[in-house]
Amino acid sequence: MYGAFEGDLVRPLGFVTLHAAYAEGELDELLSVLPARDPYDDNKRQWTIGRKLSYASRLVRELRSPELNELRAILKDAKELFQQRNELVHGRLFAGGRLLSNRIGHSERRVSQEDIVRFAEQLFNWKERLWLSRCRHVLPLVSSLHEQHDA
């Protein structure tokens, strides 16, 4: 269980932030290979995760390829995952798992060590699904588009 001590919420939360960073890095990799009018430069890499996801969804939609249906679903799943990440990382987590949002009108909730570990694993799995889709579907599609353009 990620080597955490019983009741330790901080170590699993560290894995949430680590896996979220790797997931965002994989999204950056996807955006760097998707065809776009303007290159995916360092300015765009500084965008919020929500903006990156919207941009990636738009670029994938513009390709109009049924081979990318799975990728569309993966990108859609990410919005909820990163919203949960924001709640955990930007909220105030107290002993016993009491989580208070910094947003007005959001109620307090409880999270356990197991909840946080499970969520870290969901982020890791999402990143792996995105990587597989990029390698299996996006790269071959982009390569064939370049070949058609060069012909």
Residue locations for each model-derived region?
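Amphipathic alpha-helical interface elements
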Residues: 1-58, 72, 76-83, 87-90, ...
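Short, glycine/alanine-rich amphipathic alpha-helical segment
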Residues: 50-73, 104-121
